[in-house]
Swiss-Prot record:
SUPFAM superfamilies: Creatinase/aminopeptidase, Creatinase/prolidase N-terminal domain
Keywords of the record: Hydrolase, Plasmid
Disulfide bonds: none
Superkingdom of the source species: Bacteria
Protein name: Uncharacterized hydrolase/peptidase y4tM
Entry's EC annotation: 3.-.-.-
Molecular function per GO: hydrolase activity
InterPro entries in alphabetical order: Creatin/AminoP/Spt16_N (IPR029149), Creatinase/aminopeptidase-like (IPR036005), Creatinase_N (IPR000587), Pept_M24 (IPR000994), Peptidase_M24B (IPR050659)
Family in the record: Belongs to the peptidase M24 family.
Enzyme class, UniProt record, top EC level: hydrolase
Species annotation: Sinorhizobium fredii (strain NBRC 101917 / NGR234)
């Protein structure tokens, strides 16, 4: 039995684009370690990335080679498009061993397949490519030159296919249901963790037609004074009256994400806070209006900045980031960012989370929108109204 969510033709096109980038950078072999990149190129999907796993992509060999822990071989057989002979497990003696390392095994397989390889690309900034991984590879491959291939595959992922966008739309529907339940359950006297429980239930149950998966991150929920924090975790404390809650969450459909943030006010917001919300909403709308092919990420940020500067407010952190397929710890793709100096040009199929969030000295507010760039503008991935939610 094979569980694949894309056609062989799509996987082949992805691999072709990766090899074209490898050729342009003079890379003979690419060692892919970022879980989202391995999934993108083969379909591999298991929670096994806490041990060493890699996909070896060869410039002169048609098929890549998956290498992972022996007990995870079955997951590779079930979830990838690779024939069994390209699924290579390493024995458990390499797992969490002080004197052995799976990089030694990976090096052996690389030399067996490409003995004349001169340059090897590695993802230096990937979360699951450690300093020891790199040091062990260097020791095991003393005659090759290592090149930093950080984000090589990530940039191939930047433009989504129609099937990918369809999965992101489905993730967006789950996101909407999660936020709806959060708003329904959250109220003064309710424990924060009970709001989280309702969110998780909506996240996993999904819709009548498809379910969800755990997102890369727990819901970031800042209640009361902690609304000033961008990435707080919920507690078992009860919600106060006349307080604010910032809730950031994302549905996940086959590892594809569509995040959203909303602010909930419990009680009657003072006019100053209503004004702040109106400024943020106006700036978000202005930024979305600027989205179209040919515009740069910096251009979108400029639209936000002009809108907010009219009210004397400056956002120091970035306004957004590219999204798509992702694994823990982040649903961001780590490529394009909506901010000053990012001259990435928007193209149809690129997807972003426009993060209209402000974390100020005495409060915070987050009203955001995930979207896909289209031929004429943008398509929102969620339909939840962009507004301050008031529960009086």
């Amino acid at each position: 039995m094979r569980i694949l969510h894309f056609s062989d033709a799509e996987y082949q096109q992805r691999m072709l684009r990766v090899k074209q980038r490898m050729q342009a950078q003079d890379i003979d072999v690419l060692i892919v370690t970022e879980p989202a990149n391995i999934n993108y190129l083969t379909g591999y999907d298991a929670w096994s990335f806490y041990t060493v796993q890699a996909l070896l992509v060869f410039q002169d060999v048609d098929l890549p080679m998956w290498i992972g822990r022996s007990i995870d071989k079955q997951s590779a057989i079930v979830t990838t498009n690779l024939p069994d002979e390209r699924i290579i497990p390493y024995p458990d003696i390499y797992v969490h061993s002080p004197d052995r390392h799976a990089a030694q095994f990976i090096a052996q397989m690389l030399l067996r397949e490409a003995p004349r390889a001169k340059t090897v690309g590695v993802e230096m900034g990937a979360y699951y490519y450690t300093a020891r991984d790199h040091a062990e590879l260097q020791k095991a491959l003393p005659n090759v030159a290592f090149k930093d291939a950080e984000l090589l595959v990530n940039w191939v992922r930047f433009i989504k296919s129609e099937r990918e966008i369809a999965y992101m739309r489905e993730a967006g529907v789950i996101t909407e249901r999660m936020m709806k339940r959060a708003v329904e359950v959250a109220a003064p006297g309710v424990r924060q963790c009970d709001v989280a429980a309702a969110i998780y239930h909506a996240q996993m149950s999904g819709t009548e037609n498809y379910g969800g998966l755990p997102a890369t991150s727990p819901p970031h929920m800042g209640f009361g004074e902690r609304a000033r924090e961008p990435h707080p975790i919920f507690t078992d404390r009860r919600i106060d009256t006349n307080s604010v809650a910032n809730i950031e969450l994302s549905g996940c459909r086959l590892r594809y994400h569509a995040p959203m943030s909303r602010t909930v006010y419990f009680g009657r917001p003072p006019q100053s806070y209503r004004d702040l919300a109106s400024y943020v909403i106006e700036a978000v709308e202005t930024s979305l209006d600027a989205v179209r092919p040919g515009v740069t990420c910096e251009g979108i940020e400029l639209a936000w900045r002009k809108s907010m500067s009219a009210h004397g407010i400056e956002k120091e952190n970035r306004l957004g980031y590219s999204i798509g397929i992702a694994y823990t710890p982040t649903w961001g793709e780590r490529t394009a960012s909506i901010r000053r100096t990012d001259l990435t040009v928007l193209e149809p199929g690129a997807a972003f989370h426009l993060m209209g969030g402000l974390w100020l000295a005495n409060t915070g507010i987050t009203i955001t929108q995930s979207f896909v760039v289209t031929a004429t503008g943008h398509e929102p991935l969620t339909a939840t109204p962009r507004e301050l939610v008031v529960k009086d």
